[in-house]
Amino acid sequence: MVPSPAMVTTVAVSICSLTAAVIDLRTRRVPNGLTGAAAAIGVAMALTRTGRVGIVGAVLGAVVGLTLMLPGYLWGATGGGDVKLLAAVGTFLGPDRVLIAFFGMAIGGGLLALATAVVRRRFFNQTFAYAPAIAIGALFAVFK
């Protein structure tokens, strides 16, 4: 039995985003090799499909993901790896579903920030790994 494109996308996004989340929690970095490989796989998968997540959809998904995360990077709220991770996820999801992932990420990030603040008993001037929030949003988008 050949897996459906949706199943392959779900597995690929899950592996990519959860791996990035674990690495970010451990090292506070999202490796370029991971985001680059994920984006390359997303584009390669898109070349085999048409429609919403064909090659045009993959490129638009990356551009939308990058555009949504860029202000946070420019303001110093997120790291470059976080920006590249959402862009890579966008190659799998396309522009419409990466937008859903972004909103899921914002909600997940808010909850993670609150939990981090409560655990640390510090509510201001703190940082935390953001790839787990991106993973929450990406998983929300693929399982929605």
Model regions and ranges:
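A membrane-topology feature that recognizes alpha-helical transmembrane segments
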Residues: M1-K144
